[in-house]
């Protein structure tokens, strides 16, 4: 993961849409405290099974990203690799609004989404521009793309 090599990640990490959980497990192996969430109960069960024999700093939770206000405390880093561009338009606002509950003023949000400039590839998927606009509407001040 290049973000590690670039020194962009900080202690407490949320991996949103964590299946297949390799990022969460990798970051935990490096000493980061990681919470991996996915809306899929099956994905979380598989992640827990994979890590049950490992001693690591990762916890997996089956959770809808729009309900992150249920978490206590804040995350220093949020990683969204392919989660946002696969949700419905009607879920954009709750998805991004939840970030304001879990991020503090120095938190970083990293997003990998389909580019809106290549419409033949993303079709119905949502791109980074929509994510950026939704974050601004929800007062998330810092955004790393």
UniProtKB/Swiss-Prot annotation:
Q: Which InterPro entries match?
A: Methyltransf_25 (IPR041698), SAM-dependent_MTases_sf (IPR029063)
Tell me the keywords, alphabetical order: Methyltransferase, Transferase
Question: What does it do?
Answer: Probable methyltransferase.
UniProt record similarity statement? Belongs to the methyltransferase superfamily.
Q: What is this protein called?
A: Uncharacterized methyltransferase C977.03
Pfam families, A to Z:
Methyltransf_25
Q: Which GO terms describe its molecular function?
A: methyltransferase activity
SUPFAM superfamilies associated with the record: S-adenosyl-L-methionine-dependent methyltransferases
Q: What is its EC number?
A: 2.1.1.-
In its UniProt record, which GO terms are filed under biological process? methylation
Top-level taxon of origin: Eukaryota
Task: State if Methyltransferase is listed as a keyword.
Answer: yes
Q: Does the keyword Methyltransferase apply?
A: yes
């Amino acid at each position: 993961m290049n973000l590690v090599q670039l020194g962009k990640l900080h202690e407490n990490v949320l991996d949103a849409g964590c299946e297949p959980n390799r990022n969460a497990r990798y970051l935990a192996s490096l000493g980061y405290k990681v919470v991996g969430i996915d809306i899929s109960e099956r994905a979380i069960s598989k992640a827990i099974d994979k890590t049950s024999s490992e001693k690591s700093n990762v916890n997996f939770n089956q959770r809808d990203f729009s309900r992150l206000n249920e978490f206590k405390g804040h995350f220093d880093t949020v990683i969204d690799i392919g989660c946002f561009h696969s949700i419905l338009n009607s879920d954009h606002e709750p998805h991004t609004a939840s970030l304001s509950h879990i991020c503090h003023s120095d938190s970083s949000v990293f997003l990998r989404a389909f580019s809106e400039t290549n419409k033949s590839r993303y079709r119905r998927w949502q791109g980074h521009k929509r994510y950026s606009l939704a974050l601004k509407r929800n007062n998330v001040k810092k955004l790393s793309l």
